[in-house]
Curated annotation (Swiss-Prot):
It comes from Vaccinia virus (strain Western Reserve) (VACV). One of its GO terms (biological process) is microtubule-dependent intracellular transport of viral material towards cell periphery. It comes from the Viruses. Keywords: Acetylation, Disulfide bond, Early protein. Interacts with host KLC2; this interaction promotes IEV trafficking by engaging the host kinesin-1 complex. Interacts with protein OPG056/F12. This is Protein OPG064. Belongs to the orthopoxvirus OPG064 family.
Amino acid sequence: MISVTDIRRAFLDNECHTITKAFGYLHEDKAIALIKIGFHPTYLPKVLYNNVVEFVPEKLYLFKPRTVAPLDLISTITKLKNVDKFASHINYHKNSILITGDKSLIVKCMPYMIISDDDIRFIREQFVGTNSIEYILSFINKESIYRMSYQFSENEIVTIINRDHFMYEPIYEHQVLDSDFLKTMLDRYGIVPINSGIIDELCPEAIIEILMAVVRPRDAIRFLDIVNKNQLTEDSVKNYIINDIRRGKIDYYIPYVEDFLEDRTEDLGIYANIFFEDAIDITKLDITKTELEHISKYMNYYTTYIDHIVNIILQNNYIDILASIIDYVQDVLTEELCIRIVCESTNPVPVTSLPIHSTLVMVMCIQMKYVDIVEFLDEIDIDTLIEKGADPITEYTFTTRWYNKHNDLITLYIKKYGFCPMMMKRLMFEYPLTKEASDHLLKTMDENRGAIMFFPRTICTLPYLLCCNYKLIQKPIPFKEENRNIVYKKNNRVLCFDSLENSAFKSLIKIDSIPGLKTYNMKDITYEKSNNIICVRFIPQESIHNEERRIKLQLFDIARLASYGLYYIPSRYLSSWTPVVNMIEGREYTNPQKIECLVILDLFSEEFIEYQNLGNAVSNKYELEYTISNYQAAINCLMSTLLIYLVLGSIRSISRTENFVLSILNIFYKGLKINELLSEPVSGVCIELNKIKDRASSGDSSFIFLKKNELSKTLSLCEKVCVETILDNNQSFKSSK
């Protein structure tokens, strides 16, 4: 349980109405300790500034921009890849950032700065050369474009749009463009020429051709707004738009229809009532299912005919359509119809729109995995919800007032997330708790210290363990005396590094000192410094030609190196998958969407990071919003690596999948020197891996896309292995398992 004793004391002693207010009364040391673990309000008092700068500078965004010193800001954001949280601070200190002349820093900050014409002139003076200014300007934001008079070149426009497609909108509003360029952009990028530069090129045929390319209602409305009215009255244009409306593109043409099609209501058919009040008696029409689907969004224009529409829906069993207009048909909904809507409609309906909140309807919602089950609390007590297997604690619940209405819901939240700084921060500092609800929350947490509320199941889950202050054991790397009497052949390789402090060089030297590695392809390493360059010479290891054996031994090496504090980041296979982040934020995670490479490649020293630098390295590699701990980053590395070697290894394996999986797990444990044996069957894992293997074998792609939850059993296995790794590294905790 997160310790809130000091916060509770401050809350009571100072008669605070919010927990945020109480946080401001904490002693600085106590406050900084909580800030370090990510447990803090959405803003901090000035008194904590110096301590935050010293101990957790990445949290400077919690102060108002004017409070943050420019040098402190620049020093901090220079080290971070993801600076989204500093957006207002970056813009506030724009001049200080531009004056640095640091191109990479300016590029990083461009999306957040409101750039003026004077700023562009300054940047041009700082960075001479067309390519430099074009590259820097490609990161500009739309707010800047709306405020400047600078005219972008066509090359600059293409570069900007290549980086962010939707930047076409402010650019096209900003300046008149050549018609040939506009046509090219339409053909190449599908960008509608909403620019006065196209007006002279328009004719009815061109207007229709452009409308055929429109994919956003806003673009259609804005394009028609610049077209000459005489051309909009052409019959060919009218006929095309009427047909487009009948195809369901209603939002695209609402202003146009009201201005130009008042005399064509009969041609519009059932859709006419959307634009003109009760223009058509729809009871005289033969209404199709497609038309009902199209008008369901606009049911407020058909209230006169609701009974007629409902009769058609029920006669034809169109439950999906009934669900889409549920707020207009409350009087006809029985318990049976509510259950049918819940079970048969493609999209979930809001629980608040279901007029009957019976236990049976609730059970059906639970089975269909509704996220707003909490709304049944208006009729059903929380114990019944839990008894029936409901989880009323979801993202949706934060959008309601239920936490202030039910103290039992807060208690349930604490049982689920009381160990998690991120999730408790959301409820305590970001949700508008009343004074009474805040008091209950602090009292419950303070009176249930330790892990008492999380026994017996939660304490052995990976999300719980990731939020605890545990460590992974690092064996000391043995000293290896350098051998200078090695005879190198001419074809032996040489690697060069810029300094002895280069992280890849340091990893290489440490790897060379670790005994028992099987596949690392460098041996007999020596190095010397020459002209400020570090030259490393080595003899390549002999290749292992048996692919399955190579994969297994390589995983052993990765695990062995991890046991010595050198961790492998498999980002070349998984470019954006960070399951640990989801877990520490209390969110569900699924398998990665894509594995970038289907071949297990050789290992290189630059892919291994020392444990003490791992949190920063992983956070920057994946451009996270905040820096995770070294411990959390290590588990992310181990889990990702194990998943990759299970999936890609099984694709390459010629053994029975079950034998391969068990072998991989044993090798992984052996490399980490963990005395564990898997006690559960892996048949479900094998089924998943075999499906992936069949799919990969039938294609010739160098990568593979994965469906959501396609590897749920495999992920569960990886999670359990990580749990065993943590427990083995923290024996005192393991005894409570």
